[in-house]
């Protein structure tokens, strides 16, 4: 089985409401750009991966750059190769475009998806087997000017079954403490609280804020 084509599908996914955080490059968004990658083989089996083009800490990726990296650098290296030699292929990509992690993630996911389809097993079987029957997930609450709106978002997530609430922080530490207090008082010990400043705080300010958040029992 050989790789014969790599397909890239750009998407722009709109948010239902604006999403605000403290990331230095982009504090508020109305949508997110994603790239779906499908790897095709000569046996008709294909695998799908996905990545984001999000200008935030650790990444300045845009869709065009992701597509060009995959089409112009990755695809020539992958064509004719066995998609089952995953570690070898990823090492080739890393050497050709060092630290292009977002593009590489989509290709890597597609290779694992393809291999799992070929062997007729879930991907976790290729990664050493199942560790647990389910995985708990959380919901992220955007920074809002209206505190009640943040509580309402968290309540909506709770009603949908989420028990881990992650609040965005880092723009105004005083507001962060007020929100943490309000959400903890609203839910009591029914949820676990987490916080994410998206690189919006330096080390000294982060320590000061964390100290103030201690009474609200963050994970």
PLM segments and residue spans:
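N-terminal capping/lid subdomain adjacent to the active-site entrance of alpha/beta enzymes
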Residues: 1-194, 198-207, 211-216
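Cleft-lining beta-strand/loop regions that shape enzyme active-site pockets
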Residues: 219
